[in-house]
Regions:
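Transmembrane helical bundles and short interhelical boundary loops of multi-pass, membrane-embedded
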Residues: 3-4, 237-248, 253, 278-282, ...
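Membrane-interface transmembrane helices that cradle and orient dolichyl/undecaprenyl
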Residues: 21-24, 28, 166, 205-245, ...
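Short helix- or helix-capping micro-motifs
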Residues: 50, 175-180, 187, 253, ...
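Aromatic-rich transmembrane-lumenal/periplasmic boundary elements in polytopic membrane proteins
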Residues: 58-104, 297, 301-302, 310-386, ...
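Short acidic/glycine- and proline-prone juxtamembrane loop motifs at membrane-interface regions
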Residues: 64-65, 147, 164, 187-197, ...
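Start-transfer (signal-anchor) and selected internal transmembrane alpha helices
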Residues: 1-53, 297-310, 495, 499-505
């Protein structure tokens, strides 16, 4: 998949081929040094764009937005206590400030030592708390700093992974650009929720899995070459105990799971994919018993290289709870809980207490059916039927700088429609093309989408939200960038065809930019006239 704007600098044949833009770009990348510069300038450029869109006015609004009321306060208490502490209840007298108002006004140390039951593991909240330690708990920029930095890093990872996967700096840069300017990605980098943190670790694990695939391919080819040269058979392949990138994947997805349990879905999908990849790589290398070798020899070893690493990482994220005395359920057995008996009676009380806590978290999450006005059925996620409204403040003329009859400040977790819907089409197109062409790159991206989406179809009756899709959106924009590459074609295509493709892609990207500019006030809480706010609700269900 190449175009004139990729790293491919092969000679342009005589005749009317390519576009004039190709001619200019070929002259621009006329040296190896310039090609190397472009390889990093593209991803870094879109990362800089992402940083501007995420960091500028990050501290606005100076109030706890949506579920920041949980994660900001939990982040602050956990870095002090090692577990999430409770906060005072809201006063019955409406004339008195609420707990959130007191926190926003600078009363940040009013949490107590009493433990609070929580629904998610602690790692993401530790990272949030670290940002608050850097900038102060009363600084709303500090509340959101960690999620913003990791959101920016996710754009960079998306760009370099797509560049490596499709061997095209253009496609990688496009993938990073589409994520950089997308509204859901911007909002989840500017509002302190756990999902943006989860996404970073998931994409990190995805990149490690890609590196493992190439590392393993080289080792298998070298093994077969050595065996063949020595006149030995290649019936069974080698057992690869040292796979550093597979270990790194287990670590990254352990960190993802330590942020939100949905990280386990990615671990399961990525681990199975690694075995399937082993199987196909062994077949390609010429190993006779390629299937049995992958499943019977390598799969158990790959399991040991990933799952225990992820499990230890997850448990380690609870260190603050283990060393505390007052964490939730920390003294469950001592206060009447039933100690294990039989073959598990040797397990320390601290681990039994912790396991009971995990079972309570599981029960809470599985049984979460509380109605919410912005809950979104996973069956409708791909059509973006119910994006999440996270913040809205209305003002009248002359109030807080409002110059219209009526103004509003809104933060809505809605994707750029021209990115989201095009990405959905691209995912379907890549699925069809994979069936027809069996390109492993397509399967790799589709696996990332499937890992993030399909498990949620088991919970269509749960209270879940559209913004959960951020965890697999990087893979959707990779699919979209790959589809754009297919539309562009090759630099040696006939000039009329190539020129039309470049123009159409340019028009599409221009529409994406204009749409992002139009939606930006709705992603960042800018004060705008109410009529402008209302114009963004293209579907009744978006309001």
């Amino acid at each position: 998949m190449t175009s004139a704007l990729t790293d491919d600098r092969t000679a342009v044949p005589d005749g009317p081929v390519g576009s004039r833009l190709d001619d200019w770009w070929g002259r621009t990348l006329s040296t190896a040094r310039r090609v190397a510069l472009w390889r990093w300038a593209g991803p870094l450029g879109v990362t800089l764009l992402a940083a501007v869109l995420r960091l500028v006015t990050l501290g606005h609004p100076h109030s706890l937005v949506f579920d920041e009321t949980y994660y900001v306060k939990d982040g602050w208490s956990i870095v002090h206590l090692g577990y999430e502490g409770t906060w005072p209840g809201n006063p019955a007298d409406d004339s008195q400030p609420t707990t959130d108002q007191r926190f926003v006004d600078g009363q940040t140390d009013i949490f107590t030592n009493a433990a609070e039951f929580i629904a998610h593991p602690p790692l993401g909240k530790y990272l949030i708390g670290l940002g608050m330690l850097l900038f102060g708990a009363d600084n709303s920029f500090g509340w959101r700093f960690a999620v913003a930095v990791l959101g920016i890093a996710t754009v960079f990872l998306t760009a370099v992974i797509a560049r490596s996967l499709f061997r095209s700096t253009l496609i990688g840069t496009l993938a990073g650009f589409l994520l950089a300017v997308d509204g859901q990605a911007i909002v989840l980098s500017r509002v302190t929720l756990l999902d943006g943190i989860l996404t970073f670790f998931v994409v990190l694990g995805f990149g490690a899995l890609l590196l493992d695939r190439r590392w393993t391919s080289r080792r298998l080819d070298a093994w077969v070459a050595r065996r063949t040269a020595a006149g030995r058979d290649t019936l069974w392949g080698p057992v690869l105990w040292w796979r550093p990138w597979l270990i790194a994947m287990g670590l990254a997805l352990g960190l993802a799971t330590a942020t939100k349990w949905s990280g386990m879905y990615f671990l399961a999908f990525f681990a199975v994919y690694s075995v399937l990849t082993d199987m196909m790589l062994r077949k390609r290398a010429g190993i006779e018993f390629w299937s049995s070798s992958a499943w019977l020899q390598q799969a158990p070893v790959s399991f040991l290289l990933t799952v225990p690493i992820a499990a230890v990482t997850y448990v380690a994220s609870w260190t603050g709870w283990f060393v505390s005395k007052d964490g939730w359920d920390r003294n469950w057995i001592a206060t009447g809980g039933e100690r294990w008996t039989g073959v598990l009676s040797w397990v320390p009380d601290s681990l039994q207490n912790w396991w009971h806590y995990q079972s309570e978290i599981y029960g809470f999450n599985i049984g979460l059916h509380t109605p919410h006005s912005y809950q979104a059925n996973p069956l409708l996620w791909l059509v973006m039927q119910r994006p999440t409204s996270m913040y809205y403040v209305g003002t009248n003329a002359g109030q807080d700088g409002c110059t219209a009859t009526r103004c509003g400040e809104a933060i809505t977790g809605i994707a750029n429609p021209f990115v989201w819907y095009a990405a959905v089409v691209a995912v379907v197109a890549l699925l069809v093309l994979w069936i027809l062409r069996r390109r492993w790159e397509y399967a790799f991206v589709l696996m990332g989408v499937a890992a993030g989406y399909l498990p949620w179809l088991l919970y269509v009756d749960r209270t879940v939200f559209q913004f959960y899709t951020i965890a697999f959106e990087p893979f959707m924009v990779m699919a979209l960038a790959a589809a754009i590459g297919l539309v562009l074609g090759r630099r040696d295509d006939p000039r009329p065809r190539r020129t039309r493709a470049v123009v159409w892609v340019g028009v599409y990207l221009g529409v994406v930019v204009l749409a992002s500019a139009y939606w930006l006030p709705m992603w960042t809480g800018m004060q705008v006239p109410w009529d402008f706010v209302r114009s963004h609700y293209w579907l009744p269900s978006w309001l």
